[in-house]
A protein has these predicted regions:
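N-terminal Rossmann-like NAD(P) cofactor-binding subdomain of oxidoreductases
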Residues: 1-138
Length: 138
């Protein structure tokens, strides 16, 4: 099983997580949120372990009735690959964290080409994407 972490469980991330969960050879090892809101409850309903970007906010999540599995860094350490669905401009700051744990990464959403050095579109460069450690999806 390929262990997938979804960093950023919002508009894009929740769709990515559901698509990954539907694959027979992949499993969601965790999703992340920055605030204890409705999407965090959706993640729990779907059985996705919830990790948080700022572990100092753990009490706020638990006070809202949302159990926290750990920090984003702990989630990344457990994953084989990370799908970054954080808001535009945030994902680039995560690049060093993924490299620290030698994780493959896919950026979804608003990051620039430079974040991965490769922008993927299935209709034009599928073959070139094979074997890459990082990619940005456009």
């Amino acid at each position: 099983m390929i262990k997938v972490a979804v960093n950023g469980y919002g508009t894009i991330g929740k769709r990515v997580a559901d698509a990954v969960a539907a694959q027979p050879d992949m499993e969601i090892i965790g999703v992340s949120k920055t605030k204890p809101g409705a999407e965090a409850f959706v993640a729990l309903e779907r059985g996705y372990p919830l990790y948080i970007a700022d572990i100092s906010k753990k009490e706020a999540f638990e006070k809202a009735g949302i159990p926290v599995a750990g920090s984003v860094e702990e989630m990344i350490a457990k994953a084989d690959i990370v799908v970054d669905a954080t808001p535009g401009g945030v994902g680039v700051s995560n690049k060093e964290l993924y490299a620290k744990y030698q994780k493959k990464a896919i950026w979804q959403g608003g990051e620039d080409h430079e974040v991965a050095g490769f922008s993927f579109n299935s209709s034009c460069n599928y073959a070139e994407a094979l074997g890459r450690d990082t990619a940005r999806v456009v």
